[in-house]
Amino acid sequence: VFFAVLLVLQPSPVPERPMLAGAIIEAELGDPLWLLSETDRGNLLKLRAVAAGSAESGKDYELWVVPEEGRPLSLGVLPASETHQVGLSDEAQSSLSGSRTLAISLEPEGGSPTGAPTGPILHVTRLYEL
């Protein structure tokens, strides 16, 4: 009687690292205005104003997700200074995961009254994996 035992060693699974994404919104001269990062769950954007400065009197900067199709989705008014967090709705998460594109417009104080950009689009950027 002959018995054989075969041992198979499998490598330990490598834990999947969370994907990190970020963007830099720059002025024409290359100075960063805001730094953006996406949490590993994709449901929160963290923004830090670097050299943005305040919008002109009676105006605010507004952040938008630019989907691959359809109209932009507002993520709210951007602070001219400080760090700010923006919670993303399911719709915004879905749009951002597809297009990875954000835009900033100049809007009336308090943001767009229509839910769509009404002022000039000042900056467009993409989120990139870090």
Question: How should each PLM-predicted stretch be described?
Answer:
Residues 1-130:
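N-terminal targeting/export leaders
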